Amino acid sequence: MVLVGSVATSERFQRQLVDAVSAYTVGMPWEASSRIGPLIGPADGKLLRALTTLEPGQSWLVEPERLDDSGTLWRPGIRLGVQPGSEFHQVEYFGPVLGVMTAATLDEAIDLVNQVEYGLTSGLHSLDDAEIQHWLARIEAGNLYVNRGITGAIVQRQPFGGWKRSVVGAGWKAGGPNYLYGLTRWIDAPPAAPTDYTDALPERIGALAEGWPTGADPISAAALRAAEAARASDGDVTWLRRALASDAIAWETEFGVVRDVTGLVREQNAFRYQAVPVTVRFGSGRVVDLIRVAAAGLRTHARVSVSAPRFEPGVDAYLGSAGVSWWAEDDEHWRARARHLAATGGRIRLIGTDVRATADAVGGSPDVALYDNPVVSAGRVEMLPFLREQAVCVTAHRFGTPRQIEISILS
């Protein structure tokens, strides 16, 4: 917990916090009065240290108390004076102990939270709309909660999954619209004719699909020029044209908007996306596959980098003009680059190359996610590696008075 400004020195708030924590009844699950149950096993290691040992400068506001011989039942505790960079600041403890930090400003508090390697859930209590907007724009976590508790995620309302080291691999939020995408392997299918699916689309999006991308869409126009410069076949150019249209539709209807599918009056449950850096390794295959993947990333506004043994004429110029970093390098140099990514973290999209060699190079690092599905024309699938999801839940009333907050797309 980070207390900002005057609340950090408020005796009234401190009394309320102590009262709230002390009011919890600790007991076994079969006891109806229990609010806090046992640990899954006896406290040991870092958790036992968190429950019993203070770091320099810290003090107990409420000291945890062991309640049984097994070491699984503990009365919750609160420690004050947690310093930036200390063990209690940086480490996750799965037990009934709360650490309190202080910050002079909201930005300082956000920085303290974002310094942690993990980013599963985060919450804010504030009645200032500007503070809420600022916090929503800067905090790094997969599930955000405003003016309510930060647990109890419900399927569809608050799809569950984190950022940073709170997520491992190429999966997506449980209970969200993309969860099954990460559990399957996608292959391309013959594209449907535009008239097969545009009837149900909004007029503006339907018009885009009917006409396919033209010069009015700079991302698509640049990609098509690159394909022509690389002497792609007419069939490949047609496939690329339809893939680019699929990207535009996916962006306008899913990835580039903020959606609240629940429509509740007293609670806002927004789902949105943020672009993330991706390194693409192209080994072999159709040049339009590389152009198509790069264009998908550019559509999301992600920072895209490309590595390949060589580039067809015009492709390197296309990438450079679009702001994409690119390297012509052999497999040995690529593996060295992948090892560097293992140290810094990131996502890798593999095209026409052996995933095992790259997996060996990154050494199983949990900070790297590998995507090696065949390239597909569906934007709803191909754009996902360039995005991360965020669920935002806001209590939309104050003592029954409606109070809506604008939740914007992430930059």
What does each model-identified segment do?
Residues 45-58:
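Long, low-complexity segments enriched in small/aliphatic residues
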Residues 60-65:
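Diglycine-centered glycine-rich loop/turn motifs
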